[in-house]
């Protein structure tokens, strides 16, 4: 990613980015995004070795970017600096793997039952904490042999076709969620094709491997551009994947004109599943054959969802379900930030950041928390013992299964 050298001159030194930073609020030693971003960037541009070990503690939540009144790309400056920062060997090796969840998924799903058993063992977690600096308190999500396929049914010319970008978690951990996305869109008149894409690249950026993120972006752009040329829009069910496709592809590919133009086209043609369905709701085309239910929900908006500037589509959709009461928690970052919360040296920071959210959930006493981000779900369940689910699952469960999909009537 290339940051405009003059962007630092737009910094007013107002410190509003520090006020918005979740880590700054819980760790008095953390210098904050203003210092790690534009202040040190002035020295970096002069060739001064000014990188700090604190760079690694940036969550990558982009709250600093949203807060900045002058649009300074603070998080991008930090991400670029993080990519140049040298780490101890053990952390570098761990972060190399964390930057490649697709590769990790392929290896663990060769024999998923054995992989899951090994990763769940306390002894294995102990050795991972000693050898790889992975927090022993964390439990890895179960891996499943990838079996998400484009359904043969309902691929008719009359339906609007969309290209589903599944992401690594759906592909290797929750393919059932991917099938539910397809079923939900099917019930609302869409034909869904599953994209043959890899990792979006967010974990690579988060772990300081911008070069790997660039390679991932190029591979994905080739596939997604073909879908757009075929007249499809792209839909995502993961807030981080959606952020990458809409916002960050252009940043990591801006030095390559051909790919940068394609990335811009992809950004303009990408929607979250919730955005797509809110559009149907506003047009009066949403399938509202919902059965009455008695469910008390709390909704948590992930940071990467907020960074897309699309409002809260899932909060509005879940409010349409009869018998459902839902509270928008608006309690800040959960602190997990993908692989961040798995790192031993960051576990306590991760939990401290999430404490405000945990307290709000415990006060609200919902039966369930709805949130689009898989690692937000993991953190919420880890910090509160309250079940967290993707809104797709909740909305799909609300349909009257006796009634057919919209365009089959």
Q: Could you tell me what each predicted segment is?
A:
Residues 1-8, 45-55, 185-188, 319-323:
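Short, intrinsically disordered, charge-biased short linear motifs at domain edges
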Residues 1-3, 28-50, 309-316, 351:
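Short, charged low-complexity linear segments at domain edges
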Residues 5-24, 50-72, 172, 304, ...:
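Cysteine-centered iron-sulfur cluster-binding motifs in ferredoxin-type domains/subunits
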Residues 16-41, 57-84, 244, 373-375, ...:
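Iron-sulfur cluster-binding cysteine motifs and their immediate structural context
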Residues 46-49, 63, 96-100:
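A ubiquitous short alpha-helical element
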Residues 74-409:
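Iron-sulfur cluster-binding electron-transfer modules in prokaryotic oxidoreductases
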């Amino acid at each position: 990613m290339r940051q405009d050298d003059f962007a630092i001159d737009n910094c007013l030194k107002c410190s509003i980015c520090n006020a918005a930073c979740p880590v700054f609020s819980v760790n008095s030693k953390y210098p904050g995004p203003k210092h790690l971003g534009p202040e040190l960037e002035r020295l970096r541009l002069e060739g001064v070795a000014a990188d700090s070990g604190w760079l690694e503690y940036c969550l990558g939540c982009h709250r600093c970017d949203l807060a900045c009144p002058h649009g300074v790309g603070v998080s991008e400056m930090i991400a670029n600096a993080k990519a140049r920062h040298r780490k101890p060997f053990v952390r570098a090796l761990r972060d190399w793997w964390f930057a490649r969840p697709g590769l990790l998924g392929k290896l663990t799903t060769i024999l998923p039952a054995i992989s899951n058993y090994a990763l769940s063992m306390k002894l294995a977690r102990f050795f991972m904490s000693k050898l790889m600096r992975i927090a022993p308190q964390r439990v890895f999500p179960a891996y499943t042999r990838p079996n998400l396929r484009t359904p043969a049914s309902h691929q008719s010319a009359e339906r609007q076709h969309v290209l589903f970008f599944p992401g690594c978690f759906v592909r290797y951990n929750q393919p059932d969620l991917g099938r539910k996305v397809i079923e939900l869109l099917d019930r609302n008149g869409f034909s869904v094709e599953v994209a043959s894409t890899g990792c979006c690249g967010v974990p690579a950026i988060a772990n300081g491997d911008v070069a790997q993120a660039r390679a991932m972006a190029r591979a994905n752009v080739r596939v997604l551009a073909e879908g757009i040329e075929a007249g499809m829009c792209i839909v995502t069910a993961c807030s981080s994947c959606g952020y990458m496709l809409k916002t960050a592809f252009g940043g990591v590919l801006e030095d390559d004109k051909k790919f940068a133009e394609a990335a811009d086209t992809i950004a303009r043609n990408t929607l979250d599943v919730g955005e797509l369905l809110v559009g149907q709701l506003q047009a009066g085309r949403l399938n509202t054959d919902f059965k009455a239910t008695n469910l008390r929900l709390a909704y948590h908006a992930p940071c990467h969802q907020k960074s897309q500037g699309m409002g809260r589509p899932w909060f509005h959709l879940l409010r349409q379900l009869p018998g459902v009461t839902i509270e928008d928690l608006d309690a800040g970052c959960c602190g997990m930030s993908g692989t961040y919360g798995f790192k031993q040296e960051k576990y306590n920071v991760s939990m401290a950041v999430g404490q405000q959210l945990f307290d709000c959930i415990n006060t609200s006493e919902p039966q369930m928390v709805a949130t689009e981000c898989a690692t937000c779900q993991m953190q919420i369940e880890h910090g509160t013992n309250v079940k967290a689910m993707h809104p797709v699952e909740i909305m799909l469960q609300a349909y009257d299964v006796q009634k057919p999909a919209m365009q089959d009537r």
